[in-house]
């Protein structure tokens, strides 16, 4: 075991019980010189120069002071070798030594000095003097060592004294025997190893070895822990840092203007993760550990006299022993180091005096300090040497004694402190220290002839050992600018600046804190706020703690683009002119280079220009001085005034802060006035609807390692992220977050604080439910309406950041009602909770009733068999890397602001912002290698923030600025989905200020003037999501919001339509508003229902090249910035795809282009899961064809012109071949067979067709992004893993919340929720012993079900296809698709036709594949529907029988699960199903021909856009359209899509909905009377459905029982006649008044495609004109709430 060190320098090693080892120790101690002589003789060089060997020997000898030891080498041998020194070699050696000397002369001077040294007798003089000195010091060292060791053991455990002596001996034995050649020896093996490991790393290895030995010794390790109980002279706890891990190097600096050329004076970094450039940025400069006396003896005088107490030194420091050890450097003057020494001597004297006043002499142990090298000592020593040289020129070898024990006597007259005798304050004795990393100091004494920087380095290194375990180390940490918090923050990349004590002068209010001035603790708190604090300058912020040893930040001051730094002493108190800059930069302690350019000043200290441009010489004393020593920091939020200790300190802080602010991108202004810069090469993935978002989030939470930030308007703890409940109980969000917290992950949540029952979110339940899960979960509700005087606005952001690396941002809250799929079902009537997709409160309809009783999550709010749920459409997106860091910074800023404003009752930590990702850190992220090719987006985080939400002095509205710019710069179209559309209008004296409406008008006017096509597609909800009918007094919010929307769109002179009409522009040609609606059948009687599909997305897509996704609505609240707080992201994809725009070739960004198509396909009824599945399949075909095209292509050997085929042509042919095999289900096509034959191996063997054999690395975006990381169990065969694990980034400081970062709190009682206090049932329910039966489920089954759920989404009903054998084209396919699926011969002719391009063939194969899957899926639905009819018959029969028996109870619906196989009687189909109600309805039920005639009469005339004539062909197409091609969405501007498909489908769907349901809002309803009529018709339709259901039940019962009851038959006929009369009588008032029977209505609704309808812009317009729309009570509310 190597020697180890403690506070006293005594070395220990583990005790050895072996007797032989003890005997060996005694032998070694008795004969040390003999062993050393043998060792030295073995290491002597056989030939060559001895000088370099002597230099190496100084480092090698373990116990000696110099290489020229008497016992090591005979004098004659030394003299002989010295006389044989080669001049050339000595010159190289001396020049190498001198190159580190700041006062070295020219080459000629060095040559002259070399000649004098080689031919003088100084060599022998120094050798004899040092030998004599060594003899005199030997007995003294031994006696001192014994006394010193005895004293230290008396202070500790005396009973361990004997054991520790043996440990010390064993340590020396292992150093001599096990390591016969010490570090730096001449062994060949060690020499070879030394060539590979540089001196710096070798020293660090020794340091680590010493530290490890100390910890393994046991007692030193316990002493390290005991330092936490120590207090310094000020009562401060000793900082928990190990001085044994600190390395110090000192290099001189010239005190001239060249100091400006040196960089990174106050910069620290970890290992090689530093991204700064400069001479000292990555590696400490090589400083000689010792200097040869030969090389510097002739210029000692020059060196000593040229220095003074203002000499500057750069101190290079390293803390740690690993590769990422902390490295930094500071600049100190000789006076600073001397002042440190004097302060420590004062403390030592005080403790010595106090110890004498007490009988217990051990109350304070003597503080032993190493000797400090004084300049005057060197002068005196030089004078003595010169006098002796004059008096005794022949005996120049008798040099003065320079023992360290006598150095105090030489400098005893320097200060009064030096008069303390060495007996009173004992001096640190290096002879008792046996440590590897101090071996160079042990080998070489403190010699006056050494350069002062080496002597200071020696002093500081010994001081580290002397104060290693003492509380006085705090002074040393302050001197080194080393603190525990700085060490914890050192993992951050970027600039790391100065640390030190400062005093805060500014008031709490100016700093942004809300404090009380009248509480019992107010005065004490005020005093505490203005005492000294330990400040740290970090990469993009400043922070401070209470003292050096604290790790709990008391404030975090962020740098932003409005950051300013000011200092006192000038007129304007602003750093804005040349003199003020010069006043800072010409302090030699400072280093500012490129930063001066920020102020327009060139860095030329010798040639400074005055205001007239003339050169002037810099004066030593500036005209500007600082008397107040005050620094004022200001950002966009607040001010911070701090007082420095001295003018020099003020300049140093100014320098560090300016360098930090200029090095960070956060101090630069950004596009759109945003707080965040533009980021490039970002990965982005859109997530449409809650299903995709929730699944992806659950996967990301499983990957979390560090911190999780959640910012939501509302968060429901009982929300399931995966559905159905069965098998996914563990994916409930509170359980997932609890699991993360138990792993040590820190979770921070911000939610909106609702006021009473005005908003039914129950944030109090959310807060305490989450807090009760685990201490690692922290949550803040905001705003506090009463304290902040904010009653109307809300924190509306919706984003999640995981590990400051992954981010999800958009419009979806993690709460009830947001989960949905692309199908947007209206029903979920499963009896069991485990089978429900929308369990408990998640089954919601805001138009019926708002949320209530949220503390009962599993209780439904409505009758699921009567009231449909309101579907929810939303868009979220996921990003990786730098944009996630920007979002994390916004969260940190919000969190810290809320802490300053609220002062929570619980300990809640302040957070530090993340540093910017470096290139190395980005590469170490998981999935970086996988997603690097897809990381092509340019992104920027935008936000709406103001004074109330973030404390900003100036409101930020970068979201509105981006909206306006994208609309202005759009060339072809914009596509908007938003919850509201309130903009640029005036109503009832209220002016809407956001300019989005004006931007649309301006762009339309420009398009009209240029005669170029331009369109705006805008989707908004049919009605806002507020409960109560619009004609009731309770619907005040609903009416006011709709009024503002209509005023913005079509009503009033300030509306968009009115502004365009004034310019004779038809708005319909350029801007169209749409909405979404859904219909379904409702169990148990298949009753027809409808409900609006609520649009909650907040997106804008411009020209398929740029898009905005976020939480901001188009209204005043979200856009202005000073109301609701919002966040969004702007995306521009640089990966361009060739497509079409208005029929011309066009290059679109991949991300916006795919997002728009995904949304439009969903709205028009395409199966987007199938489209995505087909796209992934054919994408694999493309990759496989590109690798195997030579074996797969079907082209002839030569082309048409006789030339060979190009690679592109062969790849296209191979792709078509693979597509052919997929569609036709064969092994090869006839064309391939004719060219290759049966026996030729194409290399595929169905690979690329059979999905089980294809490399599925790109099969699914979510699986590829989340599941490809290797956690030790997954295979490496398919997906390449990142080179570095995610953990290589390390844990951030925010991960230490609650531990090192304890947090702050106010003096008030803890807040609680009585519903959760001592609520054991809720705790059991969270643990899994509740209604969802989590703990009762089999873990194995649970994991399997959860893992396969995502595949069930996309692969549901895809297990088999309609065409799966050779006769597949001829097999039965659903009616309606027979016109679109071609027969086999037609498809083959198409694929072999040379006139058809390969691109069209490839596109056709995709369409056919999609139709095959879709037809099978519809066939499955038909089977399920027939089964439901059979169940309905059984139910109706049973209900009738039970009614007859006088029972009112109905049996449960015997509904089987969707996935179960059913045996449905095929005789129910067609005519037999029709006969169930034909006797009742007779001719009232319309057939398909009658429906076509009816629709042709009610559909309005369609005018051709180009010719202006009535287009009958388009009207016919509108009637018979029953298929949407999912690959016809590429060109949104061409009239065949925008008018012929998009608008046509919306118009037809709108008419069909009105025809059946008479639903509102609708343009046909102009006044309250018509509103009432439509409401009555809607109710009548529902009543008629119920009557028809009852009659069918009776008819079924009579058919099944064959019982003739005349009275009952008559009653049935009467009811049927009455129903027919109602149905026929309704036609008298026109088709708008027609009420259809259920079966005719269902036939009409089956012609609806998708969910798209036209937004009614003229609903109840007459009532608005007559001022009857708004109730009088509506005018009482503040209009700012609703616009």
Swiss-Prot record:
Activity is dependent of phosphatidylinositol 4,5-bisphosphate and the regulator SRF1. Inhibited by magnesium. One of its GO terms (biological process) is cell morphogenesis involved in conjugation with cellular fusion. It catalyses: a 1,2-diacyl-sn-glycero-3-phosphocholine + H2O = a 1,2-diacyl-sn-glycero-3-phosphate + choline + H(+). GO terms for cellular component: endosome; nucleus; prospore membrane. InterPro entries: PH_domain, PLipase_D/transphosphatidylase, PLipase_D_euk, PLipase_D_fam, PX_dom, PX_dom_sf. Residues 291-487 form the PX domain. SMART domains: PH, PLDc, PX. Residues 496-664 form the PH domain. The modification N-acetylserine is found at residue 2. One of its GO terms (molecular function) is phospholipase D activity. Residues 141-150, 392-404, 1437-1451 have a biased composition (Polar residues). Residues 1-150, 173-198, 259-289, 384-416, 1430-1465 are annotated as: Disordered. Residues 116-125, 263-279, 405-416 have a biased composition (Low complexity). Transmembrane segments: none annotated. Its EC number is 3.1.4.4. The modification Phosphoserine is found at residues 8, 30, 145, 1461. Residues 791-818, 1091-1118 form the PLD phosphodiesterase domain. PROSITE patterns: PLD. The modification Phosphothreonine is found at residue 1462. Belongs to the phospholipase D family. PANTHER family: PHOSPHOLIPASE (PTHR18896:SF76), PHOSPHOLIPASE D (PTHR18896). Interacts with SRF1. Required for meiosis and spore formation. Seems to be involved in the coordinate induction of late meiotic events. PLD activity is induced under sporulation conditions and seems to be necessary to complete the meiotic cycle, but not for vegetative cell growth. This is Phospholipase D1. The gene is SPO14.
């Amino acid at each position: 075991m190597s020697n180890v060190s403690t506070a006293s320098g005594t070395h220990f090693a583990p005790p050895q019980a072996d007797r032989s080892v003890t005997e060996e120790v005694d032998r070694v101690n008795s004969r040390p010189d003999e062993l050393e002589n043998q060792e030295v003789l073995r290491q002597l060089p056989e030939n060559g120069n001895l000088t370099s060997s002597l230099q190496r020997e100084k480092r090698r000898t373990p116990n000696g002071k110099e290489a020229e030891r008497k016992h090591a080498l005979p004098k004659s041998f030394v003299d002989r070798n010295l006389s044989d020194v080669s001049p050339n070699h000595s010159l190289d050696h001396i020049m190498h030594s001198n190159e580190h000397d700041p006062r070295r002369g020219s080459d000629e001077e060095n040559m002259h000095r070399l000649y004098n040294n080689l031919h003088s007798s100084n060599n022998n003089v120094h050798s004899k003097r040092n030998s004599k000195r060594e003899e005199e010091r030997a007995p003294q060292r031994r006696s001192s060592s014994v006394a010193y060791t005895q004293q230290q053991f008396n202070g500790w455990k005396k009973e361990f004294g004997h054991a520790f002596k043996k440990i010390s001996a064993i340590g020396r034995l292992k150093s001599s025997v096990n390591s016969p050649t010490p570090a730096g020896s001449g062994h060949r093996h060690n020499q070879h190893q030394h060539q590979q490991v540089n001196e710096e790393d070798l020293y660090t290895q020794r340091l680590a070895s010493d530290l490890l030995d100390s910890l393994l010794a046991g007692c030193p390790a316990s002493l390290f822990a005991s330092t936490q109980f120590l207090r310094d002279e000020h009562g401060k706890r000793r900082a928990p840092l190990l001085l044994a891990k600190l390395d110090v190097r000192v290099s001189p600096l010239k005190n001239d203007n060249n100091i400006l050329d040196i960089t990174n004076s106050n910069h620290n970094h970890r290992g090689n993760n530093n991204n700064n450039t400069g001479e000292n940025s990555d590696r400490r400069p090589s400083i000689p550990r010792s200097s040869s006396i030969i090389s510097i003896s002739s210029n000692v005088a020059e060196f000593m006299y040229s220095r003074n107490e203002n000499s500057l030194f750069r101190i290079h420091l390293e803390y740690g022993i690993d590769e990422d050890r902390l490295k930094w450097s500071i600049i100190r003057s000789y006076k600073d180091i001397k002042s440190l020494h004097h302060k420590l001597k004062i403390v030592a004297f005080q403790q010595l005096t106090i110890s004498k006043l007490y009988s217990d002499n051990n109350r304070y142990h003597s503080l032993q300090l190493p000797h400090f090298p004084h300049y005057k000592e060197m002068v005196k020593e030089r004078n003595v040497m010169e006098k002796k040289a004059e008096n005794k020129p022949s005996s120049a070898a008798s040099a003065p004694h320079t023992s360290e024990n006598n150095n105090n006597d030489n400098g005893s007259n320097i200060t009064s402190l030096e008069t303390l005798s060495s007996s009173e304050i004992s001096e640190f004795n290096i002879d008792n220290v046996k440590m590897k990393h101090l071996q160079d100091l042990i080998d070489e004494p403190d010699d006056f002839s050494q350069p002062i920087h080496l002597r200071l380095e020696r002093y500081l290194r010994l001081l580290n050992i002397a104060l290693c375990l003492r509380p006085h180390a705090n002074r040393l940490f302050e001197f080194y600018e080393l603190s525990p918090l700085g060490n914890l923050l050192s993992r951050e990349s970027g600039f790391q600046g100065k640390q030190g004590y400062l005093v805060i002068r500014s008031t709490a209010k100016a700093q942004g804190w809300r404090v009380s001035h009248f509480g019992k603790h107010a005065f004490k708190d005020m005093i505490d706020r203005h005492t000294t604090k330990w400040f740290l300058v970090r990469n993009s912020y400043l922070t401070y703690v209470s003292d050096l040893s604290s790790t709990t930040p008391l404030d975090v001051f962020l740098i932003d683009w409005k950051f300013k730094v000011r200092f006192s002493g000038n007129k304007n108190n602003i750093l804005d002119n040349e003199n003020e800059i010069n006043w800072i930069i010409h302090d030699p302690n400072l280093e500012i280079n490129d930063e001066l350019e920020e102020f327009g000043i060139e860095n030329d200290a010798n040639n400074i220009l005055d205001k007239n441009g003339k050169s002037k010489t810099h004066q030593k004393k500036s005209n500007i001085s600082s008397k107040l020593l005050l620094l004022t920091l200001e950002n966009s939020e607040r001010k911070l005034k701090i007082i420095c200790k001295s003018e020099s300190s003020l300049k140093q802080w100014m320098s560090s802060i300016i360098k930090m602010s200029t090095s960070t991108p956060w101090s630069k202004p950004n596009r759109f006035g945003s707080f965040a810069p533009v980021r490039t090469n970002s990965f982005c993935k859109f997530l449409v609807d809650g299903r995709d978002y929730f699944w992806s989030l659950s996967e990301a939470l499983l990957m979390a390692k560090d911190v999780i930030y959640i910012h939501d308007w509302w968060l429901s703890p009982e929300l399931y992220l995966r559905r159905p409940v069965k098998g996914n109980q563990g994916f409930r969000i509170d359980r997932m977050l609890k699991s993360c917290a138990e792993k040590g992950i820190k979770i921070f949540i911000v939610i909106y604080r609702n006021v009473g029952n005005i908003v039914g979110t129950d944030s109090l339940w959310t807060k305490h439910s989450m807090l009760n899960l685990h201490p690692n979960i922290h949550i803040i509700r905001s705003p506090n309406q009463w304290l902040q005087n904010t009653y109307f606005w809300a924190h509306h952001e919706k984003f999640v950041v995981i590990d400051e690396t992954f981010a999800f941002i958009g419009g979806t809250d993690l709460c009830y009602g947001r989960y949905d799929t692309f199908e947007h079902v209206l029903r979920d009537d499963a009896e069991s909770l485990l089978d429900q997709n929308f369990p408990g409160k998640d089954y919601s309809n805001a138009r019926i009733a708002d949320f209530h009783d949220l503390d009962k999550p599993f209780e439904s709010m409505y009758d699921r068999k009567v009231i449909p749920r309101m579907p929810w459409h939303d868009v979220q997106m996921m990003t990786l890397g730098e944009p996630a860091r920007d979002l994390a910074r916004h969260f940190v800023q919000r969190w810290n602001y809320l802490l300053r404003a609220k002062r929570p009752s619980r300990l809640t930590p302040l957070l530090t912002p993340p540093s910017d990702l470096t290139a190395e850190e980005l590469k170490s992220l998981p999935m970086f290698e996988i997603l690097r090719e897809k990381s092509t987006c340019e992104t920027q985080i935008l936000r709406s923030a103001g004074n109330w939400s973030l404390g900003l002095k100036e409101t930020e509205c970068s979201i509105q600025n981006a909206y306006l710019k994208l609309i202005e710069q759009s060339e072809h179209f914009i596509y908007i989905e938003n919850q509201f559309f309130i903009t640029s209008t005036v109503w009832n004296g209220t002016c809407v200020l956001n300019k989005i409406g004006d931007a649309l008008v301006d762009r339309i006017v420009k398009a009209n003037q240029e005669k170029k096509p331009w369109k705006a597609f805008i989707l908004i909800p049919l009605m806002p999501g507020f409960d109560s009918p619009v004609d009731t007094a309770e619907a005040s919010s609903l009416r006011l919001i709709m009024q503002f929307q209509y005023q913005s769109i079509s009503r009033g002179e300030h509306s968009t339509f009115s502004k365009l009409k004034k310019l004779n522009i038809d708005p319909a040609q350029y801007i169209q508003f749409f909405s979404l609606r859904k219909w379904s059948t409702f169990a148990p009687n298949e009753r027809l229902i409808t409900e609006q599909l609520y649009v909650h997305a907040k997106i804008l897509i411009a020209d398929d090249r740029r898009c905005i996704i976020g939480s901001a609505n188009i209204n005043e609240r979200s856009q202005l910035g000073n109301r609701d707080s919002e966040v969004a992201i702007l995306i521009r994809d640089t990966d361009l795809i060739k497509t079409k725009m208005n029929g011309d070739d066009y290059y679109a960004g991949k991300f916006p282009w795919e997002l728009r198509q995904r949304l439009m396909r969903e709205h028009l009824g395409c199966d987007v899961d199938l489209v995505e599945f087909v796209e992934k399949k054919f994408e694999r075909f493309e990759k496989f064809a590109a690798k195997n095209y030579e074996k797969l292509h079907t082209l002839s050997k030569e082309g048409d012109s006789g030339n060979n085929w190009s690679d592109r042509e062969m790849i296209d042919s191979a792709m078509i071949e693979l597509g052919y095999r997929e569609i036709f289900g064969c092994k090869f096509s006839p064309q391939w067979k004719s060219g290759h034959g049966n026996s030729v191996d194409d290399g595929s063997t169905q690979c690329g067709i059979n999905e089980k054999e294809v490399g599925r690395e790109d099969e699914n975006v979510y699986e590829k992004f989340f599941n490809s990381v290797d956690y030790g169990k997954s295979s490496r065969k398919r997906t390449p893993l990142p080179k570095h694990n995610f953990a290589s980034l390390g844990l951030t400081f925010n991960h230490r919340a609650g531990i090192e970062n304890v947090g702050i709190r106010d003096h008030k009682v803890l807040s609680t929720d009585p519903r959760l206090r001592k609520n054991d049932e809720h705790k059991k329910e969270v643990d899994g012993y509740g209604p969802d039966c989590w703990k009762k489920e089999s873990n194995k089954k649970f994991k399997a079900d959860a893992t396969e759920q995502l595949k069930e989404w996309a692969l549901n009903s895809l297990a088999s296809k309609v065409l799966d054998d050779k006769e597949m084209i001829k097999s039965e396919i659903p009616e309606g698709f027979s016109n679109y699926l071609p027969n086999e011969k037609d498809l083959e002719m198409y694929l072999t036709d040379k006139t058809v391009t390969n691109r069209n063939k490839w596109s056709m194969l995709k369409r056919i594949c999609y139709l095959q899957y879709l037809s099978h899926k519809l066939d499955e639905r038909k089977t399920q529907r027939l089964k439901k009819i059979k169940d309905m018959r059984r139910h109706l029969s049973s209900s009738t029988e039970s009614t007859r028996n006088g029972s009112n109870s109905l049996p449960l619906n015997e509904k089987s699960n969707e996935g179960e196989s059913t045996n449905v009687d095929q005789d129910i189909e067609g005519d037999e199903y029709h006969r169930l109600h034909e006797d009742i309805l007779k001719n009232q039920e319309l057939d398909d021909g009658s429906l076509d005639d009816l629709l042709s009469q009610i559909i309005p005339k369609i005018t051709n856009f180009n010719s202006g004539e009535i287009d009958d062909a388009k009207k016919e197409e509108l009637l018979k359209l029953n298929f949407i091609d999912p690959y016809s969405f590429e060109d949104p501007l061409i009239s065949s899509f925008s008018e012929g498909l998009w608008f046509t489908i919306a118009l037809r769907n709108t008419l069909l909905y009105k025809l059946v349901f008479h639903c509102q809002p609708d343009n046909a309803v102009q006044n309250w009377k018509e509103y009432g009529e439509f409401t009555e018709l809607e109710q009548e339709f529902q009543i008629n459905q119920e009557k028809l259901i009852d009659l069918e039940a009776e008819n079924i019962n009579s058919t099944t029982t064959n019982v003739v009851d005349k009275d009952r038959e008559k009653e049935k006929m009467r009811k049927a006649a009455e129903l027919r009369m109602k149905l026929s009588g309704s036609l008298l008032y026109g088709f708008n008044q027609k009420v259809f029977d259920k079966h005719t209505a269902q036939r009409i609704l089956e012609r609806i495609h998708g969910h798209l309808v036209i937004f009614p812009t003229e609903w109840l317009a007459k009532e608005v004109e007559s001022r009857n729309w708004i109730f009088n009570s509506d005018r009482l509310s503040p209009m700012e709430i609703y616009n």
